[in-house]
Curated annotation (Swiss-Prot):
GO terms for molecular function: 6,7-dimethyl-8-ribityllumazine synthase activity. CDD domains: Lumazine_synthase-I. One of its GO terms (cellular component) is cytosol. This is 6,7-dimethyl-8-ribityllumazine synthase. It catalyses: (2S)-2-hydroxy-3-oxobutyl phosphate + 5-amino-6-(D-ribitylamino)uracil = 6,7-dimethyl-8-(1-D-ribityl)lumazine + phosphate + 2 H2O + H(+). PANTHER family: 6,7-DIMETHYL-8-RIBITYLLUMAZINE SYNTHASE, 6,7-DIMETHYL-8-RIBITYLLUMAZINE SYNTHASE DMRL SYNTHASE LUMAZINE SYNTHASE. Belongs to the DMRL synthase family. One of its GO terms (biological process) is riboflavin biosynthetic process. Keywords: Riboflavin biosynthesis, Transferase. 5-amino-6-(D-ribitylamino)uracil binds at residues 26, 60-62, 84-86, 117.
Amino acid sequence: MFGADKGTADKLDGKKLHIGIVQARFNENITNTLAAACRAELLRLGVQEKHIRHVLVPGALEVPVALQALAERDEYDALIALGCIIRGETYHFELVANESGAGVTRLALDYQVPIANAIITTENLDQALARQTEKGVDAARVAVEMANLLEELS
């Protein structure tokens, strides 16, 4: 929802955090902007450049596999999934959107690591372009907030 009230978070301090980013290359013009906005926001929140691991995969269905590999290393306080799925003329859109989303959620629960899911799903390119920067920033903020929350709860 564009312009939705996302509330205010108190603990957006990333100074001590290690963050892993997995970016799908499919629709690369969009995902590159997502990644740039995400990285810039992580740095603004205090995450050190050397504590950000950024890997690329072919598409959204491969994102969970790379997230799992990072989660298994147990080196990251939070992970971020970046991708862009634009509806086409076939059922493939639903398949990719549902399976990638379910995979990301399952990994977060199985590994007890926060994963900010910014695999955006849109009806068309214009919607993707309108969301690419904001969703990258949101993903960084979610990752930092949830990493801090889980640290507080442990």
